[in-house]
Amino acid sequence: MALSRGTFYFGLALFFIVVELPSGSWAGLEYSQSFPGGEFAVCETCRLGRGKCRRTCLDSEKIAGKCKLNFFCCRERI
């Protein structure tokens, strides 16, 4: 009986270890953003959270600077 109980506890521990492993993602890092303005924010407007880094700005926005990787820092027009 001791062998089956030990096997049960081993299987239970193995189950909890497997459940805690991330499921193909980088443990939620794909949703984290480095700066409040966007994922690749480097210009001051985006760094302060007043703009968003996008490939193309919307019609209601203007370009306020450049971010990394061909992204523009877009800010609402006043």
UniProtKB/Swiss-Prot annotation:
It is found in: Secreted. Belongs to the beta-defensin family. Has antibacterial activity. Keywords: Antibiotic, Antimicrobial, Defensin, Disulfide bond, Secreted, Signal. The keyword Metal-binding does not apply. This is Beta-defensin 12. It comes from the Eukaryota. One of its GO terms (biological process) is innate immune response. GO terms for cellular component: extracellular region. It comes from Rattus norvegicus (Rat). InterPro entries: Beta_defensin_dom (IPR025933). Disulfide bonds join C46-C73, C53-C67, C57-C74. Pfam families: Defensin_beta_2 (PF13841).
